[in-house]
Amino acid sequence: MVVAVPDTSRPAAHAIGEMLGAPCREGFIKNRYSGRTFIMPDQATRNAALRLKLNPIREMFEGNRVLLVDDSIVRGSTMKRIVRLLRTLNPAAIHLAIFSPPVKHPCFYGIDMPSEEELIASRMDH
C-alpha cells in the first residue's frame, strides 16, 4: 500500500500507487495548525512539532507493507522520527520514496536551511 506524508506528497503518492497498481491510502491524521517542521529553528522544536503534527492510523500500518511517499527530505530527522514511530505499529515493511531532487546545498534566501553537513543528501553517494 502507498501512504503519503501529508499534505504536499499526495499527488505523487497517488501517481506512484497507480503506476504500481497498489492502493493509495490515508495513513495519518494531520494537525492543521502545525507548520513546516524543516524550517523550525532547532531540532527540539522540530521534534515537538512533529509529535503534534502527524498521528498515524494504526490499521493502515499494522501488518502491512507500506511505501511511504514524501515530497522532500532535508535533514532526514523528520523521516527518521516518522519511521521510528511507524515501526511501533508493526508494519510488515516500510519503504520510502522521495519525489523531489536531493537537497544538497543550503539556501540563504530566508528559510532556515541547515549547513551542507546537516543535509542528508550531501552525505550520500548516488
Predicted regions and their residues:
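PRPP-associated nucleotide enzymes
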Residues: 1-126
